[in-house]
């Protein structure tokens, strides 16, 4: 069974490929697997720099988090 980090990483891939809906769904699964949103956010924040390097716009990050 996939772990929370697996769902998060899959969400990152979907997002960088432009599939926002799939990314949000995968991030939602990561939150559920983590058991709470705060733990998800801690993990997500650690990956922000990598997301920016992959072409995600800094202004889009809070928008994505609002979708969750």
Located regions from the model:
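Terminal, low-structured helical/coil segments at or just beyond the last alpha-helical repeat
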Residues: 34-68
């Amino acid at each position: 069974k996939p772990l929370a980090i697996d769902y998060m990483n899959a969400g990152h891939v979907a997002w960088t490929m432009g599939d926002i809906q799939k990314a949000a769904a995968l991030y939602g699964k990561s939150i559920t697997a983590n058991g709470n949103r705060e733990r998800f956010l801690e993990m997500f924040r650690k990956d922000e720099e990598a997301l920016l390097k992959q072409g995600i716009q800094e202004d889009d990050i809070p928008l994505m988090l609002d979708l969750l």
